[in-house]
């Protein structure tokens, strides 16, 4: 990488929010009903396929539909993760579930498999609603439904989000041949469809919110969720999932539920992303580009995601990288929706190996080839660090996370991360890192 002029990137504020701090689950209740809390420690694990398995438990033990088991085999999954072992047996029985588990342990598969297991498709009736906070995550969840419903040809799934023509959504809903049984959506667009009487949700049996803390923390989104929730039947299953749940958000989640099973996988106070190597680099702001180029030149990686703190810095850094022989794409909230989805697909399909992003890509996005995450700008809060570095080393695979530390504020955040998650983040070694420690063989 050439380094003509070590220019600092211009910085303008970005509107994306940071995750709230969170705490571990002690107990829970909903009115007078006592809610059960299950804590799972990650012990006696063994590496199996793409998930970390415990003992010899397999997906067949859940007595899933043969069509689902075939799809699971096609995906190459042998053993369920900890969160799947605890959640799936309860969720397929219709139990309300509030689940907090760290990034990369297969939470999405829990609600996808459990809703497909329970689904008996009726033409023209929506049975499952899944809400999430970004278009990219909605698109990804829809793809997970497509993967696991591969051998369930009668099941129809649709994704609705703002920024695309609403008339296309209306036409899809009104056509009985395409009317979905499973709807994945962002709250604003789904509320608009419900409000204007284009969509009826009187037959919904399962209501899911992924990254529920992010959805319910934002007042506008929470209001949309409440309006959607009101038009669904009183008797239904409600499931919510996230990597972080604060003391403030947890009771809000439980207002939507009836005696939920609360599940906490491992000690949320510890950052135990197995196989993820974590380092930091002391570097002046003006030298970040040079250091980043050195890392990209010298490190082996499949795909890398580079996090910055604003849309303007994402644009600026991607231009610098492309100009210096590192083809990359940028994903952030300032890009029109259709273009964002196109860039996400381009990266997921391995057409680009480098992605520069704001925190819009910091939650829930699952791209299996990512094994390197770089915090060009450290997040302002410790919890967002967990979501960011969780993009690498998912599902028990290896990965590497490197954070640039440039200011006194960065040093404070780094200290908070290490204290918050009881993890030691060491200086990046001068001799580099052995690829075998973060590259899967």
Curated annotation (Swiss-Prot):
Short motif DECD box, span: 210-213
Domain Helicase C-terminal: 275-436
Major enzyme class: hydrolase
Residue span(s) of domain Helicase ATP-binding: 88-263
InterPro entries: DEAD/DEAH_box_helicase_dom, Helicase_ATP-bd, Helicase_C-like, P-loop_NTPase, RNA_helicase_DEAD_Q_motif
Acidic residues biased stretches: 1-17
Compositionally biased region (Basic and acidic residues): 33-46
EC number(s) on file: 3.6.4.13
Motif Q motif per record, residues: 57-85
GO BP field: mRNA 3'-end processing; mRNA export from nucleus; mRNA splicing, via spliceosome; subtelomeric heterochromatin formation; transcription elongation by RNA polymerase II; transcription-coupled nucleotide-excision repair
GO annotations of cellular component type: chromosome, telomeric region; spliceosomal complex; transcription export complex
Record keyword RNA-binding present: yes
Biased composition, class Polar residues, residue ranges: 21-30
Keyword vocabulary terms for this entry: ATP-binding, Helicase, Hydrolase, mRNA processing, mRNA splicing, mRNA transport, Nucleotide-binding, Nucleus, RNA-binding, Spliceosome, Transport
Region described as Disordered: 1-47
Location(s), subcellular: Nucleus
Swiss-Prot/TrEMBL catalytic activity: ATP + H2O = ADP + phosphate + H(+)
Any one Gene Ontology molecular-function term assigned to this protein's record: ATP binding
Binding site for ATP: 101-108
Domain comment, as recorded: The Q motif is unique to and characteristic of the DEAD box family of RNA helicases and controls ATP binding and hydrolysis.
Family: Belongs to the DEAD box helicase family. DECD subfamily.
Function in brief: ATP-binding RNA helicase involved in transcription elongation and required for the export of mRNA out of the nucleus. SUB2 also plays a role in pre-mRNA splicing and spliceosome assembly. May be involved in rDNA and telomeric silencing, and maintenance of genome integrity.
Protein's recorded name: ATP-dependent RNA helicase SUB2
Species of origin: Yarrowia lipolytica (strain CLIB 122 / E 150)
Gene behind the chain: SUB2
């Amino acid at each position: 990488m050439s380094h003509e002029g070590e220019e600092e990137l211009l910085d303008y504020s970005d509107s994306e929010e940071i995750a709230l701090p969170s705490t571990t689950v002690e107990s829970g209740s909903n009115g007078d009903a006592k809610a059960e809390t299950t804590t799972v420690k990650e012990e006696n694990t063994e590496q199996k396929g793409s998930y970390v398995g415990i003992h010899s438990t397999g997906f067949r033990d859940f007595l899933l539909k043969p069509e689902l088991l075939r799809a699971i085999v096609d995906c190459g999954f042998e053993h369920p993760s900890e969160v799947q072992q605890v959640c799936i047996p309860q969720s397929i029985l219709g139990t309300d579930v509030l689940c907090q588990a760290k990034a990369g342990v297969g939470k999405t598969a829990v609600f996808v498999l459990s809703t497909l297991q329970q689904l008996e498709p009726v033409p023209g009736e929506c049975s499952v609603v899944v809400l999430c906070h970004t278009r990219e995550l909605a698109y990804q969840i829809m793809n997970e439904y497509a993967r696991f419903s591969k051998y369930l040809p009668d099941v129809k799934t649709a994704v609705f989000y703002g920024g695309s023509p609403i008339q296309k959504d209306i036409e899809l809903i009104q056509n009985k041949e395409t009317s979905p049984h499973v709807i994945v959506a962002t709250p604003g667009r789904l509320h608009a469809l419900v409000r204007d009487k284009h969509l009826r949700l009187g037959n919904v049996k399962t209501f899911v919110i992924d990254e529920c803390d992010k959805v319910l923390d934002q007042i506008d989104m929470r209001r949309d969720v409440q309006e959607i929730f009101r038009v669904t039947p009183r008797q239904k299953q409600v499931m919510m999932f996230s990597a972080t749940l604060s003391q403030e958000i947890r009771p809000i989640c439980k207002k939507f539920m009836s005696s939920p099973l609360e599940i906490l996988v491992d000690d949320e106070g510890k950052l135990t992303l197995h196989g993820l190597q974590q380092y930091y680099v002391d570097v002046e702001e003006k030298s970040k580009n040079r250091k980043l180029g050195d890392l990209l030149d010298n490190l082996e990686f499949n795909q890398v995601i580079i996090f910055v703190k604003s849309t303007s810095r994402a644009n600026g850094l991607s231009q610098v990288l492309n100009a210096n022989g590192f083809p990359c794409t940028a994903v952030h909230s300032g890009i029109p929706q259709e273009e964002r989805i196109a860039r996400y697909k381009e990266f997921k399909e391995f057409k680009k190996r480098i992605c520069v992003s704001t925190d819009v890509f910091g939650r829930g996005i699952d791209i299996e080839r990512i094994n390197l995450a770089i915090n060009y700008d450290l997040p302002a809060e410790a919890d967002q660090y967990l979501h960011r570095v969780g993009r690498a080393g998912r599902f028990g695979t290896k990965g590497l996370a490197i954070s640039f530390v440039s200011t006194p504020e960065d040093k404070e955040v780094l200290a908070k991360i290490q204290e918050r998650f009881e993890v030691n983040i060491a200086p990046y070694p001068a001799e580099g890192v052995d690829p075998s420690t973060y590259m899967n063989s």
